[in-house]
Design a protein with these regions (language model features):
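N-terminal nucleotide/polyanion-binding subdomain common to many enzyme families
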Residues: 3-7, 12-101
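Conserved beta-alpha
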Residues: 85-112, 122-173, 177-178
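Short, flexible loop segments at boundaries between secondary-structure elements
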Residues: 156-161, 204-241
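Proline-aspartate-enriched helix->loop->beta-strand connector
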Residues: 174-183, 187-188, 195
């Protein structure tokens, strides 16, 4: 299967109505295909049952997921549903946001280490989103795990909607950093919609991943499910058990809604 790349055209903003269906989405097939993604400016989003349900009632979010360059299946439910409904894409496995993060960071670390041996400048990775406290923890851990990378951060204002001035400040900060890898972490669907809406204003030439929860996982402020739960497709159940008050609606009601949406497809 070829990498699920829609194309690297910067002109992503499209006012046409999107008919959002899992059956017709182009989704990356396996973790191995991450190595085949083209270089340059590339928008990488994730999809799971929750984000699918949200996109069904949020037109801009649906456009962001449909018109991005790469869509990865961050949920066993997506993998199984694609098989069940005989979708165009047949992903072989779940690719978590953490898998994307680890792959991209390790790749950039190797490239940066090689540059450092030649006395050249380090590669730059930028984290845009979350609180300054979390970002400080990210910088500290990155220095230990990825010592050859230069880490730049930006914590946007904590508000439901950014003003035009806020957006300009964020965009200017990203463009000034000119990163070799950019992570956007503001939770879904805000992070996907913001990145998609301002894509043409980002004068950068790197992979851009929207991976909200990974910021907290890497910083250590939120515990990720143990490996056994991940390998058996039960990370959602682990999160539900850890945070039942916050997660019950997303997983109990949300998973039922996702199943119903698949029946309708």
């Amino acid at each position: 299967m070829e990498p699920a790349v829609y194309g690297c055209d910067d002109n992503k903003i499209n006012s046409n109505t999107v008919m959002f269906r899992l059956k017709t989405l182009t989704i990356l097939g396996s973790k191995a295909e991450l190595a085949s993604l083209p270089e340059g400016k590339l928008l990488i989003n994730t999809i799971n049952a929750h984000s699918f349900n949200t996109a069904k009632k949020d037109q801009l979010f649906a456009e962001a997921l449909t018109n991005g360059d790469v869509l990865i299946p961050d949920g066993v439910s997506i993998v199984k549903a694609c098989k069940w409904i005989k979708a165009k894409s047949q992903p072989k496995e779940r690719i978590a946001g953490w898998d994307l993060f680890s792959f991209e960071m390790e790749k950039l670390e190797r490239e940066s280490e090689e540059l450092r041996t030649k006395s050249e400048e380090s590669k730059i990775v930028m984290f845009m989103g979350s609180s300054q406290k979390v970002l400080d923890l990210i910088v500290k851990r990155a220095a230990e795990v990825y010592p050859h990378l230069k880490v730049v951060t930006y914590s946007p204002p904590y508000k439901p909607e950014f003003s035009d001035e806020d957006n300009k400040t964020i965009i200017d900060a990203i463009n000034a950093a000119n990163p070799d890898l950019l992570w956007i972490g503001m939770t879904a669907p805000k992070q996907e919609k913001w990145t998609y809406s301002h894509w043409n204003e980002l004068n950068i030439h790197c992979h851009v991943g929207t991976i909200g929860a990974v910021f907290d996982f890497f910083a250590g402020t939120v515990e990720r499910a143990p490996i056994w739960w991940q390998e058996h497709g039960l990370e959602w159940l682990y999160r539900l058990m850890k945070e039942p008050k916050r997660m019950w609606r997303r997983y109990i009601i949300g998973n039922s809604l996702f199943l119903w949406n698949m029946v309708k497809e």
